A protein has these predicted regions:
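Class II aminoacyl-tRNA synthetase catalytic cores and aaRS-like
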Residues: 1-258
Length: 258
């Protein structure tokens, strides 16, 4: 980390069995012009010079990767997750495809698109907000199972968990229902968890989550009743607004049941 050198020499083992190199020549390959913000601890146990400022970490991700190993681990895990999903689907003979990023009509989702202009055709084009419609056209065209890891773009709000460009997996299979998709999703998530962590149980936010399939299934109506105490299955719009008001949920007269 920092200065990088290349060495020439002879490999050997030390008396304690550690593999090392007897250096005969070296070359400076890269010189670090500024000291890295590596954390230091003084005699009182106080740590300083840590690279902890969130704004700096996000804007200088290369430094963050050098000094915070857990960030690099996240990058590696992300790649492993994508590869595991891809292998899982390929083993089932699903076809990975690529669909257009620049589209004449943004579709497949309700979102504000980024707009650009095609000079040769003199027409506006949109960065895709979803690849759904093109994948469905492939199903109509005779491919029975297709999927795509795509970069999608939505010109909307932004926060820690909401980025204007993001990677999404979309999968479509002919002649199947959503119960089948539930089973596929369960087995896929379990497979990924085991491949990445070596087990189905993980710790998240001081809680243990077990991704061992199958998972509990519950309808939306039953979930609302379970967690709020209200049975909304037969309520009209006025009754639903009253329930929302009781739970301090902001609504107005323009909102319907959806």
């Amino acid at each position: 980390i920092g200065d990088i050198i290349g060495i020439k020499g002879t490999m050997f083992k030390t008396k304690v069995g550690e593999v090392t190199v007897l250096v005969k020549d070296f070359t400076v390959l890269n010189k670090s012009l500024r000291p890295l913000p590596l954390p230091k601890v003084d005699s009182d146990g106080k740590e300083y010079d840590s690279f902890t400022d969130l704004e700096q970490r996000y804007r200088q991700r290369y430094v963050d990767l050098i000094v915070n190993s857990q960030v690099k681990d996240t990058f590696i895990k992300r790649t492993k997750i994508i590869n595991t999903i891809r292998n899982f689907l390929n083993e089932k003979s699903y076809l990975e495809v690529e669909t257009p990023i620049l589209q004449p009509i943004p579709g497949g989702a309700t979102a504000r698109p980024f707009i650009t202009h095609h000079n040769a055709l003199d027409i506006p084009l949109y960065l895709r907000i979803s690849d759904e419609l093109f994948l469905k056209k492939l199903i109509v065209g005779g491919f029975e199972a297709v999927y795509e890891f795509s970069r999608d773009f939505r010109n909307e709000g932004m926060d820690k968990n909401h980025n204007p460009e993001f990677t999404i997996l979309e999968l479509y299979v002919a002649y199947k229902d959503y119960f089948w998709m539930m089973e596929l999703t369960e087995s896929l998530i379990e497979k990924v968890c085991v491949e990445i962590n070596g087990k189905t149980k993980i710790e998240y936010d001081s809680k243990q989550i077990d991704f061992k399939a199958p998972y509990d299934r519950i309808s939306m109506f039953d979930a609302i009743k379970k967690f709020t105490g209200y049975d909304v299955s037969n309520m009209d719009e006025n009754e639903l607004r009253s329930v929302c008001n009781d739970m301090s949920i902001e609504v107005d007269d323009s909102m319907g049941k959806g």
